[in-house]
Amino acid sequence: MDWATTLGTLSGGIGLFLLGMSMMTDGLKLAAGPALERVLASGTRTRWHALGSGVLVTGVVQSSSAVTVATIGFVNAGLLGLGGALWVLFGANVGTTMTGWIVALLGMKFKIEALSLPLIGVGVVLRLTGTAQRRGALGTALAGFGLLFLGIAMLQTAFAGLAERVALPQDRTALSVVSQLGVGVVLTVAMQSSSAAMTIALAAAQGGLLSPHGAAAVVIGANIGT
């Protein structure tokens, strides 16, 4: 691929991934409905219950921000103590890594184009035929999941092309590590999503543009930037 095609594929892949993640998050939150509030309200009796609730709810709705806002609302309403809220937030930060695990276990090991297009098709059918709000929301989430995987496939293609033209530092010097941390921070701040930055790092490592250690530094930077 030439430079124009590579950069176009890269920007399109990032756009599809962000759009898919947004649709998946919004759809899952609508499908969950008041379950988010019920789990947070009833699952914070002990610190371990609170931690588990944070992990579970964030893993389902794929948005630690939504869990954080709901938790703060419960604290302000006097339904949840500050100690329990802190453990919920700890769990939310663990649960938000679910996207990275999904990408690493599925998106990097299978031919995801074959999975993404059927998901988009089924999701659109559910969205258009869903008379109930929950069914339509589930369709939106499935279509978003498919777009997310399609974006990852485009990122892999783009980074494989970049790896043939660009040679990034592969050493483990302090300067290289700090620069890779900075890349992770900047990506997260620019896209307002540590999950997106994490996925870009994984795709870059898969395409040979980054070493595993470099990708790990970018992921750590993404978690700092969040």
Predicted regions and their residues:
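Short helix-coil transition sites and intra-membrane helix breaks within transmembrane domains
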Residues: 25-29, 58-66, 159-160, 187-196, ...
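Transmembrane helix-loop junctions at the membrane interface of multipass transporters and ion channels
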Residues: 97, 101-111, 126-130, 160, ...
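Residue-level signature of catalytic and energy-coupling elements of molecular machines
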Residues: 20, 62, 94, 151, ...
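Membrane-interfacial helix-loop connectors
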Residues: 69-93, 101-116, 120, 188-225
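A structural-propensity feature for long, helix-poor, extended segments
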Residues: 106-137, 141
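Alpha-helical transmembrane segments and their lipid-water interface positions
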Residues: 16, 25, 29, 65-69, ...
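C-terminal ends of transmembrane helices
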Residues: 21-30, 71-78, 122-134
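Helix-loop-helix hairpins and the membrane-proximal interhelical loops
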Residues: 1-47, 138-186, 203-204
